[in-house]
Regions:
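A beta-strand edge to alpha-helix "cap/lid" segment located at domain peripheries
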Residues: 2-41, 46-136
Length: 136
């Protein structure tokens, strides 16, 4: 492989990055609107939570959102970074979230990592991890 091939492989995929940013916005909107159809499309069937809903699968999470057990009023991302590795994308950064789980207010500042994969032309979330940053 010559250096021109390496340059082409290392070049950012701006189209995929744009698509992932849009998918990430659609995720936030679907949560806030409790849009079952959109969540079913955005979330992969083999979706898993790393935290805070570990153990919930796609169906359980969507049911909780639609029923109002999980209520997301807003997600305001900051410092979002997108990385693309072929058909896999990582979206990570921080966000201020206004949300509730049952009667608990879990609003605050979070760090997040969302893993997407492109399937049949659509980016779908396959894994999600949230954590509260430790303050020093």
């Amino acid at each position: 492989m010559d250096s021109r091939d390496e340059d082409r492989q290392a070049a950012p995929d701006y189209q995929a990055e744009h698509e992932l940013r849009r998918a990430n916005d659609e995720w936030a909107n679907a949560l806030a609107q409790r849009d079952k159809a959109a969540l079913e499309c955005i979330m992969a069937d083999d979706f898993t939570f790393a935290y805070p809903f570990e153990g919930d699968d796609k169906g359980q999470f969507i049911n909780d959102v639609v029923a109002g057990v999980v209520r997301v009023e807003s997600l305001e991302p900051r410092d979002t970074t997108v990385r693309v590795f072929g058909g896999t994308g990582l979206v990570f950064g921080s966000e201020t979230a206004n949300w509730h789980y049952g009667d608990r207010d879990l609003s605050g500042h979070y760090r997040f990592v969302r893993v997407y994969t492109k399937r049949q032309g659509l980016w779908q979330i396959v894994s999600l991890h949230l954590c509260s940053p430790t303050h020093r």
